[in-house]
Amino acid sequence: MQAYFDQLDRVRYEGPQSTNPLAFRHYNPDELVLGKRMEDHLRFAACYWHTFCWNGADMFGVGAFNRPWQQPGEALELAKRKADVAFEFFHKLNVPFYCFHDVDVSPEGASLKEYKNNFAQMVDVLAAKQEQSGVKLLWGTANCFTNPRYGAGAATNPDPEVFSCAATQVVTAMNATHKLGGENYVLWGGREGYETLLNTDLRQEREQIGRFMQMVVEHKHKMGFQGTLLIEPKPQEPTKHQYDYDVATVYGFLKQFGLEKEIKVNIEANHATLAGHSFHHEIATAIALGIFGSVDANRGDAQLGWDTDQFPISVEENALVMYEILKAGGFTTGGLNFDAKVRRQSTDKYDLFYGHIGAMDTMALSLKIAARMVEDGELGQQILKGQLSLGKLAQYAEQHHLAPVHQSGHQELLENLVNRYLFDK
């Protein structure tokens, strides 16, 4: 089979002085950072959907890309052609993982029976590709938001037949993820929210999605899946308001339904922006609450109110993110998935590489800066030890006539310190 990316053998590390746009300047997979290989710290993944499914269409224009697998033809054969190109890309980019939605890799078909048959065939194709390439599945998920039947939600839909269709997709995608050795399974409620409260029963919808998640957990244990279940927070789009608004909201939901020990979060940078938070805030909050799982590494635009899904380029932002992750012990089953897409005007097929290479270098440099912060310990925080009751603390304060003086937070000093790590050689 002829290679699609025929002008490239493989992206390799050439060092900071390289001017080759198809080489890494900072990402050296085997470089040791805090005693661990850089590849093992970062656990990079490329996503199927933006990279191979999006045809360049937007709200104001038709598809701008000329991808061979997006032309008219027999659906399964085109899906297999897409898989050929995808794994060629993963191998040449040198990423250890990939991620997918069910209908990214397989034709949906005209019925649930067709959906399951098509997906089963494509899972076999993907398994062979993984075996051949050594690329592994970071996580799988089900697309329960694109089909018109999910217009009023999937797990929150008031129609039990729609709810059942969503359950079918999720159980099938979970089984596929398990078979392919996936390390996580993601649940993103793209339409689990509302457009107006005039036709929405908030209590019922919350109870429905709570029960749905409980069933997902039950199925995980029944099938023996050892990976991590992840919810991906997002405040809005496509709905006006989504129930998984941000990390703190998801934690409250998990606590309500007794799931806080079973499900963690997959945090996307652009979703943090839409929620009015920094990416740093969402990561730190998840770690503090004990539900940090994985990351969708991208960036949004603070001036725009929608998901732009651009590649990350800010070392300043991501060094602080990687600092939080390193302090917490690093990833376990999670990783850095690039939920990002080239711009509509980027029609050259090698633009896919340019976007990912820049993003991987950004995260690699961020990791190295974060490691220096951890090693130096200047940004370390005191760890509370021991336990005292509120009454004993009050008694202590009275006996010792405490009159503490306000201590400076030194924000400016700390910001300057971060800049030293970022910009000093």
UniProtKB/Swiss-Prot annotation:
It is found in: Cytoplasm. The active site is at residues 101, 104. Binds 2 magnesium ions per subunit. Keywords: Carbohydrate metabolism, Cytoplasm, Isomerase, Magnesium, Metal-binding, Xylose metabolism. GO terms for biological process: D-xylose metabolic process. GO terms for molecular function: magnesium ion binding; xylose isomerase activity. Its EC number is 5.3.1.5. It is an enzyme of class 5 (isomerase). It catalyses: alpha-D-xylose = alpha-D-xylulofuranose. Its cofactor is Mg(2+). GO terms for cellular component: cytoplasm. Mg(2+) 1 binds at residues 232, 268, 296, 339. The keyword Metal-binding applies. Its main location: cytoplasm. Mg(2+) 2 binds at residues 268, 271, 307, 309. NCBIfam families: PRK05474.1 (NF003998), xylose_isom_A (TIGR02630). Belongs to the xylose isomerase family. Homotetramer. HAMAP family: Xylose_isom_A. This is Xylose isomerase. It comes from Salmonella paratyphi A (strain ATCC 9150 / SARB42). The gene is xylA.
